[in-house]
Amino acid sequence: MVSSTTPSSGEYLLEMSGINKSFPGVKALDNVNLKVRPHSIHALMGENGAGKSTLLKCLFGIYKKDSGTILFQGKEIDFHSAKEALENGISMVHQELNLVLQRSVMDNMWLGRYPTKGMFVDQDKMYRETKAIFDELDIDIDPRARVGTLSVSQMQMIEIAKAFSYNAKIVIMDEPTSSLTEKEVNHLFTIIRKLKERGCGIVYISHKMEEIFQLCDEVTVLRDGQWIATEPLAGLTMDKIIAMMVGRSLNQRFPDKENKPGEVILEVRNLTSLRQPSIRDVSFDLHKGEILGIAGLVGAKRTDIVETLFGIREKSAGTITLHGKKINNHNANEAINHGFALVTEERRSTGIYAYLDIGFNSLISNIRNYKNKVGLLDNSRMKSDTQWVIDSMRVKTPGHRTQIGSLSGGNQQKVIIGRWLLTQPEILMLDEPTRGIDVGAKFEIYQLIAELAKKGKGIIIISSEMPELLGITDRILVMSNGLVSGIVDTKTTTQNEILRLASLHL
């Protein structure tokens, strides 16, 4: 299926037309188009697995396209590497930043193309040119600072400045705001608009609809490897884009709430982490069947709460009471034995073993329970439980031997949640559970969470997405600079109240 709306003729910086790419048994791209104008910000949207990454890999020469044409500034191109693309004016700022943490900012800016004076690197010239670019983009970073000492948002600014230094005409940004505060997002948007004013074409990839409508001029939607539409944002609604992405209308963004919170199962009093700055005097209750959200700005120490409960961080004071009995989780194993489970924020770095199969990733948190009387692993039980994870979590995969890194983000997250459910937890803690997941898969994750709450699990969710917290939780605990600034009832609170509480102790 394709839309009747096609990009109108006109001057384009980048024209990708009729791009096809197949892998054994799979047609990854089927006659896909992407056309980007100068002085524009162009959203590239689609569910995970829609073909966005494959299309861009064809542009950068990582994959060789089967057919189709790519024109850049009116000339046909066929790059063989990302380096060649960059040298010719096409740059990409990746979600996983590609910087050398041990080197200085200006080293990273000019790596592989240092200005020289005789036989030596011209440090003064490198500093001056880096500073000039930073000044033009309103970036307040010391060019001599070591990259490893900077925040994620500052690192992203460096990546954008690097693209600027190559005089890039096309800049592709992949989920650039996933780890940024609202203030940092606004600064990033200012820089993106500066690039637009200078004549750049920006390709902006994000699952955050609010950002797309705030920033972009046009949108191209892909689905199942096909081009669906390219349209101006001004004539679209959020529901229309979602319908194009998923192939159907999503009548609601969040499932109906059918859980009924019961008695208190977890009492946390004056919890303080040993290594400061961290959480201080955190107190709250969690009820059976309740979904408790944790809100706060970046740096509020939200993650420190669940890490301290799970034994990753050592507590210096406070009590944790489970079913009326005081417990101490000195490490993750003790936490698991007490019925806690933690789905971590950084899925790819701490949640999955990307190059191993679904079976391994499903069972690793519970692996010792599969040993038989002679100490060998019970393969039939392992296979059965892996299949349970696939079926009950509705994981889309050819089979349990599939490498988990090849799955979409949503399906990876389902496997991780299923893995923890095999440990039979009473308390499931999820840190940014839908980060980097497309809108259709988000709804499926919300459904799973709602079903678990309905079955009586106590659930704690940390999220930076306010609509998510307001859409699925029963109560929201708001953190500010390591302190609890309030606990609000989701039904009666507002986004403004939560933001006010989040700023209380800054």
From Swiss-Prot:
ATP binds at G46, E47, N48, G49, A50, G51, K52, S53. It is an enzyme of class 7 (translocase). It is a peripheral membrane protein. GO terms for molecular function: ATP binding; ATP hydrolysis activity. Residues 14-249, 264-506 form the ABC transporter domain. Part of the ABC transporter complex MglABC involved in galactose/methyl galactoside import. Responsible for energy coupling to the transport system. PANTHER family: CARBOHYDRATE TRANSPORT ATP-BINDING PROTEIN MG119-RELATED (PTHR43790), GALACTOSE_METHYL GALACTOSIDE IMPORT ATP-BINDING PROTEIN MGLA (PTHR43790:SF7). This is Galactose/methyl galactoside import ATP-binding protein MglA. It comes from Escherichia coli O157:H7.
